[in-house]
Amino acid sequence: QEYFTDNQDFPHRFKGPVYKPHKYEGNKDDESKLTRQEQIDQLSQDNLYDILRRQMVKRLESSFGAFQKSMENLFNSYQHIKAFIQNSGGRYILDRQLINKANVDDPDSIEDILNQFSQNNLDGDGRRNKIYDVNKFVLKEQFFADIDSDISLFEKILKEIKNLKLVENDPKLRTLLKNVHSIL
């Protein structure tokens, strides 16, 4: 659970940069200067990050197998997103489904995805409808460092799960099976 804390003092915590890119843009530090839409977008991104963080703790509490699967999904998603950003010239969107459709090794595929995203969001003014240019982020290096930090965290957690054989020896699953057998 300490990996998914919101305590900023814990250095090896989940940072979630791909869920809240507004934190790295650095355009407006003073919230009073934000437009209403920008305030809504920032709150939305922060809430998405918080929901994911809490959901990961719940997955851990439910079963080690569910938690492992979620960690694998996050790990794969982050690697895909990082490759997408690197191979798109620094562009990023908050649409995970579209990013996952892209062949991240093919710049034409990425360009097609970005064009599709633009067409789908012609009338959208929110950040969810925005193509971020990571190269213009004030905190660009921190954005990539936090992505790498999260990837390392996921790798560490997956390694711990494997080394401790938590999925194979899940005490919650054993208790559930024992109770089911006693009922039957």
Predicted regions, residues:
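Helicase motor interdomain insertion/brace
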Residues: 1-184
